[in-house]
UniProtKB/Swiss-Prot annotation:
One biological process term in Gene Ontology: tRNA threonylcarbamoyladenosine modification
Annotated residues for binding of Fe cation: 111, 115, 307
Name of the protein in its database record: tRNA N6-adenosine threonylcarbamoyltransferase
Cofactor: Fe(2+)
GO MF entries: iron ion binding; N(6)-L-threonylcarbamoyladenine synthase activity
Positions with a binding annotation for substrate: 134-138, 167, 180, 279
Gene Ontology terms: cellular component: cytoplasm
């Protein structure tokens, strides 16, 4: 089965072709980072318009790279939610228009399910069941993943997502957009232990997260730094130390909660998905913990940590292989800007 995947939930336009027998044949991605940088964040209207411009050229790119023809495609999967309403509507409209014109069925995919399953795209995918740490700009969750469509929420953030905390910390430090990679790069120049920040809920009995207090602690420290240093190299070094303190605190919490989830479920496999999963400090800490504690940790390829069409094509193919009745030829669709992943549990 050959599935075309279309991702347009936020500021990346992604298309891909996934074959259930041959794997990922091709994927193409356009990021809108440069366009949104001058605004310091994603502008929804601009994002939607750019998806319209980019989708069909990316489709041609994917078809050319894979050697596939439109007649070879068996179904079209698209991100139905969650995400920006306008951006979702663009992707859904294009998917259904193509499906109608080509006489193909469609299937709407939960964006986070795509992230959860994205580590299955590697050469040696982890077998079910596993614990998944889903960590991105909008979500931070720990899930038990028993099979496709069989998900149990173990813990989640009570306020800010980890990626959101990274982005807001970057703004407090006067860094550019996107903030997450910028604050991580600055942290690498900081001195370990020079600034020690709180680890919210590190020792709580549950598996939930909270990052708003950590963000507030960064704000407090930043005000002190600006009052003590008018500027110059001293302030820049202090900001690097503060960035290091923030990243160390966030990573400590993510690692500790992941270990607790593995212990609670008695599983030995951890999958890390979402944009923050590309963070080098987080990967290093989890790999060290895995070696020490004797569990396996799996990540998507770095190129597939961000939003992408490959994960949507994969999720669509896996769902249609298990539940062919989920394919639709109605070509009437809704999008779900807010959509609880737990609602997919079977």
């Amino acid at each position: 089965m050959l599935v075309l995947g279309i991702e347009s939930s936020c500021d990346e336009t992604g298309l891909a072709l996934y074959d259930t027998e041959r794997g990922l044949l091709a994927h193409a991605l356009h990021s809108q980072i440069a366009m949104h940088r001058e605004y310091g964040g994603v502008v929804p209207e601009l994002a939607s318009r750019d998806h319209i411009r980019r989708a069909l050229p990316l489709l041609e790119e994917v078809l050319a790279a894979s050697g596939a023809r439109r007649d070879d495609i068996d179904a079209i999967a698209f991100t139905q939610g969650p995400g920006l309403a306008g951006a979702l509507l663009v992707g859904a409209s294009i998917a259904n228009a193509l499906a109608f014109a080509w006489d193909k069925p469609t299937i709407g995919i939960h964006h986070l399910e795509g992230h959860l399953l994205s580590p299955l795209l590697v050469a040696e995918p982890p077998p079910f069941p596993f614990v998944a740490l889903l960590v991105s700009g909008g979500h931070t969750q720990l899930m038990r993943v028993s099979d496709v469509g069989v998900y149990e929420t173990l813990g989640e953030t009570l306020d800010d997502a980890a990626g959101e905390a990274f982005d807001k910390t970057a703004k407090l430090l006067g860094l550019g957009y996107p903030g997450g990679p910028e604050v991580s790069r600055l942290a690498e120049a900081g001195t370990p232990g020079a600034v020690v920040l709180p680890r919210p809920m590190l020792h709580s009995v549950d598996l939930d997260f909270s990052f708003s207090g950590l963000k507030t602690a960064v704000l407090t420290q930043m005000k002190k730094l600006e009052a003590a240093h008018a500027g110059g190299a001293v302030l820049e070094r202090a900001k690097a130390d503060l960035a290091r303190g923030f990243v160390d605190a966030a990573v400590d919490v993510l690692v500790a909660k992941s270990l607790a989830a593995l212990k609670a479920t008695r599983l030995k496999r951890l999958v890390v998905a979402g944009g923050v999963g590309a963070n080098r400090q987080l990967r290093a800490a989890l790999s060290a913990a895995a070696q020490k504690r004797g569990f396996d940790v799996h990540y998507p390829d770095l190129a597939l940590c961000t939003d992408n069409g490959a994960m949507i094509a994969l999720a669509g193919a896996l769902r249609l292989a298990r539940w062919p009745s989920q394919a639709s030829r109605d070509y009437a669709f809704t999008v779900k800007p807010r959509w609880d992943l737990a609602s997919l549990a079977r």
